[in-house]
Amino acid sequence: SSAASDVYKRQHDFLRKGKKSPETVHPGLWRQGQLNAIHGLFEVTEGVWQARGYDISNITFIETSNGWLIIDPLTTSSTAAACLALANNVLGERPVHTIIYTHSHIDHLGGILGVTTQEEVDAGNIRIIAPAGFLEEVVKENIIAGPIMARRAHYQFGPLLPASPQGQVDIGLGQSFPLGASHLIPPQKQSTKQDQN
């Protein structure tokens, strides 16, 4: 694991000690924090793996005959790259050939440069697929509503508080927001309901 992920994990060590929730934390949030503290690479079913606990969403790796199909490359390139390295180290090195964005939330697309490059996509080595209307939704959510949502998140999740039972405990989706750069490579294909038939 990287030094950055080690620091991230150590900040929330107070949740890993199996203690009951202190008076300063709602028991439901404490339990959610303990569950979010469980991180690693998990087999969902044969050939399908998820890295959990490294970001506020999960990244899915599907083994195919010609490499990885990745679903939702997380929030930042650093967390996505760490999870791809984890999958390759544990399961064997495989090239990435397809990436699917399931929807327009930044925690499902922002880490794209951790699993591929614009050059790989431009060369036709990687396909990126998203739902119909995806780019419009990305603009609506991240450019139009983004500043308001970012401001609200400071009140909602307490990211400026120190990680402790008296400060920032968990944000529900994960331990805390990952730090790092988020990017977007537009999909070459936006699927419709018709494509699924």
Predicted features and spans:
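Conserved beta-strand hairpin/beta-sheet module of binuclear metal-dependent hydrolase folds
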Residues: 34-94
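Metallo-beta-lactamase
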Residues: 43, 129, 135-197
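Short, small-residue-biased leader/transition segments that mark boundaries at the very start
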Residues: 3-8
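Active-site metal-binding motif and surrounding structural segment of the metallo-beta-lactamase
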Residues: 66-67, 77-129
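Short, solvent-exposed secondary-structure boundary motifs
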Residues: 29-33, 49-53, 178-188
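Short helix/loop capping segments that flank catalytic or ligand/cofactor-binding pockets
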Residues: 60, 79, 110, 137-139
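Long, low-complexity, polar/charged, intrinsically disordered or flexibly structured peripheral segments
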Residues: 9-35
